């Protein structure tokens, strides 16, 4: 169950109004929760950009900020996971651990080969032991960030919806009961899976 819920009031349902308020609320929550010796996972997306923008500077030199999903979207994008991880670590005066790989690759064969790299494997192992994770929740609809940035094809989102997908966390799609949707895209992702994410407090 949930230990704490923060309700954010907005004047409209427009993303330009909702996202900054979500970011500020999350940044405030993190200010209460973060401490040295912790591991903080970070995914990617426009909401997480708002969180990073709203964070107040801190000095947490033993905190480690870890990129939990490989790079997605355009390299110059502000919502790119590595950029968000670096910015958050700098703001918090913390150390960072980047995941040196794409977030999604062309095949399971490529994914499996990359997972044998020691740097990738060690980063994912550290991410799996995190004390806290900051993630966005995506929606499998045309026009979402995953299609706008070319990460997934619209046809793949159609397939995912047909299989019951209602959202995703770090590209791991889930159904209305919160269970993982078994789609071939899972075999191409370099990042934590839903089972690992669930074990993060």
What function would you assign to each model-found segment?
Residues 1-108:
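N-terminal active-site beta-alpha-beta segment that forms phosphate/nucleotide-binding
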Residues 71-201:
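Conserved phosphate- and dinucleotide-binding cores of soluble alpha/beta proteins
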């Amino acid at each position: 169950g949930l230990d704490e819920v923060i309700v954010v009031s907005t004047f409209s349902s427009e993303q330009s109004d909702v996202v900054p308020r979500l970011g500020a609320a999350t940044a405030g929550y993190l200010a209460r929760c973060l401490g040295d010796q912790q591991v903080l996972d970070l995914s990617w997306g426009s909401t997480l950009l708002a969180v990073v923008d709203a964070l107040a500077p801190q000095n947490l030199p033993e905190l480690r900020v870890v990129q939990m999903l490989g790079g997605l979207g355009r390299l110059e994008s502000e919502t790119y996971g590595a950029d968000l991880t670096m910015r958050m670590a700098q703001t918090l005066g913390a150390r960072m651990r980047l995941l040196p790989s794409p977030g999604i690759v062309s095949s399971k064969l490529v994914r499996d080969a990359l997972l044998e790299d020691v740097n990738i494997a060690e980063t994912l192992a550290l991410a799996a032991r995190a004390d806290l994770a900051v993630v966005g929740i995506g929606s499998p609809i045309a026009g979402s960030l995953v299609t706008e940035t070319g990460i997934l094809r619209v046809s793949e989102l159609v397939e995912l919806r047909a299989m019951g997908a209602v959202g995703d966390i770090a590209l791991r799609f889930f159904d209305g009961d919160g269970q993982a949707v078994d789609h071939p895209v899972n075999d191409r992702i370099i990042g934590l899976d839903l089972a690992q994410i669930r074990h993060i407090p």
